[in-house]
Regions:
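Hydrophobic/aromatic beta-strand patches that form the interior of the parallel beta-sheet core
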Residues: 1-5, 13, 96, 139, ...
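Interdomain helical connector at the RecA1-RecA2 junction of SF1/SF2 helicase-like NTPases
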Residues: 1-76
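Conserved nucleotide-binding/hydrolysis micro-motifs of P-loop NTPases
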Residues: 9-11, 88, 126-127, 143-146, ...
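Amphipathic alpha-helical transducer elements in NTP-driven molecular machines
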Residues: 28, 66, 147-151, 179
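Conserved helicase ATPase core of P-loop NTP-dependent helicases/translocases
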Residues: 79-84, 88-130, 149-150
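A short beta-strand element within the Helicase C-terminal
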Residues: 119-123, 127-145, 149-152, 165-171
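Conserved segment of the helicase C-terminal RecA-like domain
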Residues: 156-187
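Long, largely alpha-helical accessory region at the distal end of helicase-like NTP-driven motors
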Residues: 194-208
Length: 208
């Protein structure tokens, strides 16, 4: 299931510069800023590839997906595995996390496997040797610019519980390059099994 979220237009997104100063913008304004720099890349001091990476990082860090991921996870009646982009996002999404800097990762995975906890947030893709019994729901924050890796992550999540059907929820921002990445990541999957949800209005249900 692909969930299409609008970028927020409210100017409540606070960014901190390398010099330490802060300024307030909106998710939409910030995305437009990076897109305009890319469109005029021939006059920009930064290389095109650097600008692409900076725009991708901006998309990965907008808070709207974090709010929506929590909202979506709260709707699940079964245990859910959350794939985030970095350690901070994982820690914000769940009490129990699985990532390289968490010394309790394996213990948390054991609790999740046993059904003692219902939510586990991870950063990196789980290794091929890991299987999770009774896992039917996964939520992926971002498809990344590498569509092959994104497709592998989706396929891996679907195979974590090989004996049963699983549902993968993939979050994407409307009217951004995010949608292109998702489309390319899903090219190898059966279109009949892919559905789309416009997540407009969800922010009325989610605390900022």
């Amino acid at each position: 299931v692909v969930h299409r979220l609008p970028l927020r237009t409210v100017r409540d997104y606070v960014l901190t510069t390398k010099a330490g100063s802060q300024f307030t913008t909106s998710e939409r304004e910030n995305y437009v800023y990076w897109s305009k720099r890319l469109a005029n890349a021939t006059q920009d001091p930064l290389p095109v590839e650097t600008l692409r990476i900076l725009r991708m990082q901006a998309l990965m860090n907008y808070p709207s997906k974090g709010h929506y991921m929590r909202y979506l996870a709260d709707q699940q009646t079964e245990k859910v595995l959350l794939f985030t982009c970095n350690q901070q996002q994982a820690e914000e999404q769940a009490i129990h996390t699985y990532h390289s800097k968490n010394k309790h990762s394996q213990a948390n995975l054991d609790l999740f496997n046993a059904g003692d906890i219902q939510r586990l947030a991870c950063v990196a893709q789980l290794s091929e040797g890991i299987s999770i019994p009774n896992l039917r729901v996964g939520i992926i924050w971002h498809a990344f610019g590498n569509e092959r890796k994104a497709a592998q992550r989706i396929g891996r999540l679907l195979r974590l519980n090989p004996d049963q059907t699983a549902t993968v929820h993939l979050l994407a921002y409307q009217d951004t390059v995010d949608e292109q990445w998702v489309t390319q990541a899903l090219e190898s999957f059966d279109p009949a099994k892919i559905s789309y949800v416009d997540a407009t209005g969800y922010d009325l249900l989610v605390a900022p």
